[in-house]
Structure formats: structure tokens, C-alpha cells
From Swiss-Prot:
Name of this protein: Nucleus-vacuole junction protein 2
CDD domains in UniProt: SMP_TEX2 (cd21675)
Source organism of the structure: Schizosaccharomyces pombe (strain 972 / ATCC 24843)
Cross-referenced InterPro entries: MMM1_dom, SMP_LBD
Function of the molecule: During endoplasmic reticulum (ER) stress or when cellular ceramide levels increase, induces contacts between the ER and medial-Golgi complex to facilitate non-vesicular transport of ceramides from the ER to the Golgi complex where they are converted to complex sphingolipids, preventing toxic ceramide accumulation.
Organism domain of life: Eukaryota
Membrane topology type: Single-pass type II membrane protein
Pfam family, one: MMM1
Chain positions carrying an annotated carbohydrate: 233, 489, 536, 640, 660
Gene Ontology molecular function, alphabetical: lipid binding
Primary gene name: nvj2
Spans through the membrane: 3-23
């Protein structure tokens, strides 16, 4: 009995302790899952890639920068039973996924222009077809490109905006002509991602294999990451209570929420967000003019540490709750036009937006180094309560349709900006000493090459090599060229070189500086005509200026050939100047027409001929009509003839006025009628001149004239006024019949053949009077 008890006691004592230890080990809490949760990366946020592939996904690659446009790639997961038809706006890809609820989805690309499915592998960028993702189109070697951001003036907080691009600069692109094909090789490329956060991943992947970053390798951070110390700090924060965090945020907000600097920061952020809204052409840019952040602060609840990878990627989630009255006022102007008959009017438009409630689950992400920013976004669409108050010309509008439309646009803007997968970023540190933007870099290991520019000392050495200093004047340069020309066995001095012996004026070729600072050759000619021609054709000769990268690399052979070209141009201009100019652009009228010359010569001759004829006519009238026994003195006769001349000039002037008035009232008179009238008048004048030359006061011929028998009065009985009247009629070329029916002072032959030419009538085209349009009766 005792022996049995001893055995049972020994066996029970031996097994009891191991049994207790086994129960303890079985029931004790373990941290294995937590350790794995911290170390292993989150599979939801990282893409499962092959070992050799650094990154893959859809990107937009263009050869031109999309100025003022968003280049983001819109990719959506749509169930297979709801897929749209493929078109220019939608492209259904062959990539499929399965949602957590078991629904088969397929990727659809919105606006697939210039979109590729790309991978970065072994230092090369492979671009596949966006729909058939296994069809390779282009392969780009990243080692030949420089990876920077475009535009280069963008700030650190706006690097990964959808309107900015990752610029792949090909160094030799300026030396090669762009091909007409769609090939992307040897060209500058602009890369856009799906989201700003996705663009950062592509930037690091492209930068790691680019020409300017040979030291960066995958999963190698430029700054050492102390994982042990970070893990210790995280495990020390084991309390789930977040009151301290809310108190900390509230204290900071209490100190800055009423400062002008904080308001300016909020205004700048809101203005950039509102600038993404497309406005009509009649409206100007939207500006935020006032901000009121209120007194309440957002509270943080349910702060949860999600994961921390061994590469340094941190993910934290939290629930945000805000209840307050935050408002801001935006303003713009609209230029309204009322037609061409009324002036346009500028109407001020204002919009007051008040945020009273927002709540949702937020994700905070810090990517592995060298990332220097915090990415934040809502997991799902947050609950928002907005109050919109539109105002036009200081008058508030109460149209519900307009208010709902504006509210919907603002909610869509929030969803496109800070709802997954779209994330917004905030740089927590900016290193201005870093060679490039977009991260934290080790300057000692990372050296960006700089574009070498020709140093000033190299230019001075080049000038010394040419035998001239930097302060050489124009005269010394001319002497230097003269010296070079004499050394080249040229017989003519360089300052007086004549290329053509037939060219008479000697050209003085000198070097002068133009307004751009370059040296040009000028020719000072002794002939003033050629100077004028040269000044008129300065634009033609300016094209002949020799372009030199350095003003001291000027050779005599180039100057001699250029001087010959200048002389040939001057000779051509000289011969061209002597050619008759074309009139009205008609090649058939290269010279003055014969009609124009004839009219000019007739007008010139008729003036002097008229003076001589008038003098001879006065002498003949004195000898024929005026009796020697007349009581009229020579002075009286001359005064009478001067008075008659005045009357003749007045009559001619009146005829000219009548003719001009007639032409004024008949604007449709043809040019041929004017020419025929002038020809008839000229022929009548010529015939009258012949009559004056043949005038012969023969008394016997006058007596033999049968018409003279019927004359009852003699010539001596004629009054002086009648004789002057007849003389005036003969001078004007329109002789009329004598009161007794005879022609005065004409012989028988002239009286039988001569008939006065009547003045040709002017062809006047009468116009029908314009009849007034009857008014349109009102309906």
C-alpha cells in the first residue's frame, strides 16, 4: 500500500510540473502575429511583382507636355456584366481581378490616348499595348535618359500633381531631327501616372536606373533606416487612448488658427484645388478671398497602426470627426455680352461655402525612403455636409437647382482628390541642398551632373590664341583683318577690296558690331545712289552676314567671298535700278504709254505755240482790220485786246468748270468717251491752227468772192466790238457766221471747204431715281 502510494506520488510529481508548464505554454499570449504584422508589408497597398520587375501599371507617355491639362490615367474596376463598349473614350483591357466579395471585375481605361501598360525591368522601360497587355510596343533604355520634373519651377509640395510630369530628357535629342513615325526612341518623354501617389512610385523606379542616378538600387535607401529604434518607439505606445493626441492637436490649433499666416496657407491650398474646376470662357479664375476656420477642431478616434515594412513603409489609419462651422468665400467675374449693338457688362460672382460636418476613415501613408512626404486619403467616400450660398452682384440666389449643382461639383472635387486611390500629400521636410527634388538624398553618394558651360577663361584663351585681347576695338579688328589679307598674298588691301572691276564705286569694307554684339561687314560706298539702294535692300544683304561662334574666328577667305557677294548684289541692284518700273503690277506697262507721252508733249507744245500764235495773230489783226486813219490809238487797241484775253480765259475756265460738273453728275462716263472727246478737241485745234497760218488779207480775192457782193457794209464800217468779237471767235477755233451770213476774212477756197467742228457732246448716262422702299407693315 505504501509502495503503491510512493509510486503514484513520484510519477504524479514528475508529470505534474510538465503538465502545468504545458498548460501555461498553451494558454499564454503570443506576439508572433503582431511581429509578422509589423514586418510583413501590407499586401493591399503593394502590387505583387516579379522579382525582376521593379514596378508595373498603366502610365501615359507623350512627346509633348500637356500644358494646363491633367495627364492622369483613369483606370476603373468594373464588373464584367457591366462593361461598356470599347470606343475612343473607353478601352476594356484584358486584365481581370476578383473583388473580396467574389465578383469578377475587369479594368477599363478612360481616355486611352497615349496610354501604355508599362514595366520597369533591368534598367529598361517596356511599353505594352494598354488593352492587350502582353503585346510589346517599345523598349526604352533608361540609362540614356535624365529623369527630372517638368516644369522645373514647380515647388516641392506640387511635384506629383496630375498637371506636372516626370520628364525623361534625352541628351542628344537636339542634334537629331524628329522622325515622322510614332516611335518614342531618342526623344524627350513626359510620363504621367494614375494618381499622384502612383507617380511618386514611378519617379523612384525610373530614377533608380536613369543616367544621373547610377548609385540608387532597388530597396536601397540613400538614408540608413534604423528599424530597431523605430520599432521600439512604436511598441512603447501601447495605450489605445488617444486623448493626448487630440489635446496635442487642439493646443497647436489654438495657437495658429487666428494668425494671418495660417489663413494664407489655407487660402493657397483652396485656390489650387479650385483651379482644377473647369469654368466657362466668360468667367475668370476663381480666387479665395476670405477664410474662417471657426473654433472647432477635428477629433481623432480609433487610431490604429496598420503595418511597417522592413523597407520603411508605414501605414496608419484613424477615424476623423469634425463638427463645426468652417467657411470660405470664393469670387470670380463673368463678362456677359449682349450683342454687337450693346456694350458688354462685367458681373461679379461670389460663392460662400460652409462646411458643418465631415466624418470618415482616413489612411496615412509614408512610403519607403527616399520619400519625404505623408500621403493621406479617405478609404471610402466621407460624409459631408456643405452649405452653398451663391451671390450675383451682391444679391444672394435661392435657386435650388443651381445650389444643388454647385454642391454636387464640390463633392466630386473632394472625391477626385482625397478618396482612395487618389491621395493628397504633404511634405514633412524639404531639403534644399539636395541635387534633385522629390525626396531625401545622401549628397555624398548622389551627385547630379551639371551642364557644362563654356567658361570665360576659355573664351579669353581663345582670343589670346587668335592674337587679340578681349578689349579689342573695331579699328584694331579691321587692322587685324588687313594684316591677315596681306599675309594671304592678296594684291588689294582688305579695307579696299573690289571684286568686280566693272563696278565703278569703290566699296570700303569694314567690320562693325550689330545691336546683338556680333561682327558684321559693312560697305561704305562713294556713290550716293548705291547707298540709297543698299539702304533699301538692307534686309537682303543682312542675310549674307557670316555667322561666327566667336568674333575672332574670322578668316580672310570668308571675308573675300562675302565681299564678292556684296559687290555682285550691288551690281544687280544697280542694273535693276535703271530698269523701268512696272505700273500697277502689269508687265505690259513696263514704260510710259505712248498716249501719255503724246498728251504730255501736246500740252507742252500747245502752251508755247499758243503764245507765239497769239502774238502773230495780234499783228495780223492790226494790219487787216484796223485802219491807219482810225482814231483808236495803239494803247487803246492793246487795252481792248487785254480785256478780250481776260474774257477768253474766263470763258475757258467756265467751260472747264462745266465739263467737270458734267463728269461729276455722270460718274459712269467711260474712259473711251473722254479720250474721244480729247482727240476731237485736239484735232479741231490743229485744224484751226492751219487756218490761222493760211490767213492772207487779199483784197482782190475778197472782191472776187461772190458772197462779198451781198455785203452791204464794208469792213471799215464794222464797229470795233464786232471786229474784236470775230477775232475772239477765230482764236477759240469756233468761228460763227457774220450777221450778213458770211465768214469773215476767208478766201473763196477756205470759205467753200472750211466748216467749223462742233464740240462733241458728252455722253451722260442718266440714272433712274431711287424709289423709296415702302415700310413693312407691323403684324
Amino acid at each position: 500500500m505504501f509502495f503503491a502510494f510512493l509510486i503514484t506520488y513520484l510519477l504524479g510529481g514528475v508529470t505534474f510540473l510538465p503538465f502545468i508548464l504545458f498548460i501555461y505554454l498553451l494558454t499564454r499570449p503570443t506576439h508572433k502575429s503582431e511581429e509578422l504584422r509589423i514586418i510583413e508589408p501590407n499586401n493591399d497597398c503593394l502590387t505583387k511583382l516579379d522579382k525582376d520587375i521593379r514596378i508595373q501599371g498603366w502610365i501615359r507617355v507623350t512627346t509633348k507636355f500637356l500644358q494646363g491639362k491633367s495627364g492622369s490615367v483613369k483606370v476603373q474596376e468594373i464588373p464584367q456584366d457591366q462593361l461598356p463598349k470599347s470606343s475612343s473614350d473607353n478601352a476594356v483591357t484584358d486584365r481581370k481581378t476578383i473583388s473580396p466579395s467574389g465578383i469578377n471585375n475587369q479594368y477599363v481605361i478612360r481616355n486611352p490616348k497615349d496610354v501604355y501598360y508599362a514595366t520597369v525591368q533591368a534598367g529598361k522601360l517596356h511599353l505594352f499595348d494598354p488593352v492587350k497587355t502582353s503585346e510589346l510596343l517599345h523598349v526604352i533604355n533608361l540609362h540614356e535618359y535624365l529623369v527630372v520634373f517638368y516644369p522645373g519651377t514647380v515647388t516641392e509640395n506640387e511635384l506629383f500633381s496630375n498637371r506636372n510630369a516626370i520628364f525623361l530628357k534625352y541628351p542628344a535629342v537636339s542634334h537629331k531631327k524628329e522622325s515622322s513615325t510614332k516611335s518614342l526612341l531618342n526623344k524627350d518623354l513626359y510620363v504621367y501616372g494614375r494618381t499622384p501617389s502612383n507617380k511618386e512610385d514611378w519617379n523612384y523606379a525610373l530614377l533608380s536606373y536613369s543616367k544621373i542616378s547610377p548609385a540608387i538600387k532597388p530597396l536601397e535607401a540613400p538614408i540608413d533606416f534604423d528599424y530597431a529604434s523605430v520599432h521600439h518607439n512604436l511598441t512603447a505606445l501601447s495605450s489605445p487612448d488617444t486623448d493626448w493626441l487630440n489635446a496635442f492637436i487642439g493646443r497647436i490649433f489654438l495657437g495658429i488658427h487666428k494668425t494671418e499666416g495660417f489663413k494664407s496657407l489655407v487660402v493657397e491650398k483652396l485656390t489650387k484645388k479650385l483651379s482644377r474646376i473647369k469654368t466657362p470662357g466668360i468667367m475668370t479664375d476663381v480666387k479665395v478671398i476670405d477664410v474662417d476656420v471657426g473654433e472647432a477642431i477635428p477629433t481623432v478616434n480609433g487610431l490604429k497602426f496598420e503595418s511597417l515594412s522592413n523597407g520603411g513603409e508605414l501605414i496608419v489609419s484613424a477615424d476623423i470627426w469634425y463638427e463645426g462651422d468652417c467657411s470660405f468665400k470664393a469670387e470670380t467675374t463673368a463678362n456677359i455680352k449682349f450683342g454687337s449693338h450693346f456694350p458688354s457688362k462685367t458681373v461679379p460672382l461670389a460663392l460662400v461655402i460652409r462646411l458643418t460636418h465631415v466624418s470618415g476613415k482616413v489612411r496615412l501613408l509614408i512610403k519607403p525612403p527616399p520619400s519625404n512626404r505623408v500621403w493621406y486619403a479617405f478609404y471610402e467616400k466621407p460624409r459631408l455636409h456643405l452649405i452653398v450660398e451663391p451671390m450675383v452682384a451682391r444679391k444672394q440666389l435661392t435657386n435650388n437647382y443651381l445650389i444643388n449643382f454647385i454642391t454636387q461639383k464640390l463633392v466630386e472635387l473632394v472625391h477626385e482628390t482625397i478618396v482612395m486611390p487618389n491621395m493628397n500629400d504633404l511634405a514633412f521636410f524639404i531639403d534644399n541642398e539636395a541635387p534633385i527634388k522629390g525626396g531625401l538624398w545622401d549628397i555624398e553618394l548622389f551627385r547630379a551632373p551639371t551642364i557644362q558651360k563654356p567658361a570665360e577663361k576659355d573664351a579669353k584663351a581663345e582670343r589670346k590664341k587668335s592674337g587679340l585681347s578681349s578689349s579689342t576695338s573695331e579699328e584694331s579688328l579691321n587692322r587685324h583683318i588687313s594684316k591677315r589679307s596681306s599675309n594671304s598674298n592678296d594684291t588689294a588691301p582688305s579695307s579696299h577690296i573690289i571684286a568686280d572691276k566693272n563696278l565703278e564705286p569703290t566699296s570700303n569694307i569694314q567690320l562693325k558690331k550689330n545691336p546683338d554684339g556680333n561682327l558684321v561687314e559693312t560697305s561704305e560706298l562713294s556713290d550716293s545712289d548705291e547707298n540709297s539702294v543698299l539702304s533699301n535692300k538692307s534686309s537682303t544683304l543682312s542675310k549674307k552676314v557670316v555667322e561666327n561662334t566667336s568674333p575672332l574666328k574670322y578668316t580672310h577667305s570668308a571675308s573675300k567671298s562675302f565681299i564678292g557677294e556684296v559687290q555682285d548684289s550691288l551690281q544687280a541692284l544697280k542694273t535693276k535700278a535703271h530698269k523701268p518700273r512696272s505700273i500697277g503690277g502689269d508687265s505690259s506697262q513696263t514704260t510710259l504709254s505712248e498716249t501719255t507721252k503724246k498728251y504730255g508733249s501736246v500740252a507742252k507744245k500747245s502752251f508755247f505755240q499758243g503764245v507765239s500764235d497769239a502774238k502773230s495773230f495780234v499783228k495780223k489783226i492790226k494790219s487787216t482790220y484796223i485802219d491807219d486813219s482810225s482814231s483808236n490809238s495803239p494803247s487803246d487797241i492793246e487795252s481792248n485786246y487785254s480785256a478780250d484775253d481776260n474774257e477768253i480765259s474766263k470763258s475757258k475756265a467756265q467751260n472747264a468748270i462745266d465739263f467737270n460738273v458734267t463728269n461729276t453728275h455722270s460718274p459712269s462716263r467711260s474712259i473711251s468717251s473722254e479720250k474721244s472727246y480729247k482727240a476731237a478737241e485736239r484735232g479741231q485745234q490743229d485744224k484751226h491752227n492751219d487756218v490761222l497760218v493760211d490767213l492772207n488779207p487779199n483784197v482782190e480775192a475778197e472782191k472776187s468772192n461772190p458772197h462779198s457782193n451781198s455785203q452791204k457794209t464794208s469792213k471799215n464800217d464794222m464797229s470795233r466790238n464786232q471786229r474784236n468779237k470775230y477775232a475772239k471767235e477765230i482764236m477759240t477755233g469756233q468761228p460763227t457766221l457774220h450777221p450778213q451770213g458770211q465768214l469773215p476774212i476767208q478766201n473763196v477756197e477756205q470759205r467753200a471747204t472750211h466748216k467749223p467742228l462742233p464740240r462733241p457732246p458728252v455722253q451722260v448716262e442718266t440714272r433712274e431715281p431711287v424709289r423709296p422702299v415702302p415700310p413693312i407693315p407691323k403684324l
